[in-house]
């Protein structure tokens, strides 16, 4: 269970997380109304355009870094288009915990390749 969730903007998590098959399906506009504006990433390879960074504290008191980002949306995607936003973490269990928490708290649609959230 997540005890505390913070939105970060210090760019420290971008290369420290990876995707574990869990996504949120929603529009940038709706997610921005919940989490504030995402950080725009101007990566040369165009793999990520927008990203939020979070740190949450779990029941054990551990701080966990999470990224939420659009992956390989090379075509122009409108602000209201519903797309898959990848959840990046340092382990699948952390991504699952985050997805379950924000899915329930904000009534967000979660997609998972092999886990029933």
What residue spans do the PLM features occupy?
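Residues within mature, well-folded domains
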Residues: 1-117
């Amino acid at each position: 269970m997540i005890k505390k969730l913070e939105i970060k903007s210090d760019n420290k998590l971008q290369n420290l997380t990876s995707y574990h098959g869990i996504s949120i399906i929603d529009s940038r506009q709706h997610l921005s109304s919940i989490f504030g504006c995402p950080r725009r990433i101007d990566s040369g390879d165009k793999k990520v355009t927008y990203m939020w960074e979070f740190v949450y504290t779990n029941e054990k008191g551990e701080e966990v870094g999470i990224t939420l980002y659009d992956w390989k949306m090379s075509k122009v995607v409108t602000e209201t288009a519903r797309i898959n936003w990848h959840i990046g973490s340092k382990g699948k269990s952390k991504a699952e915990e985050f997805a379950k928490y924000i899915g329930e708290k904000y009534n967000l649609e979660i997609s998972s390749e092999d886990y029933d959230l």
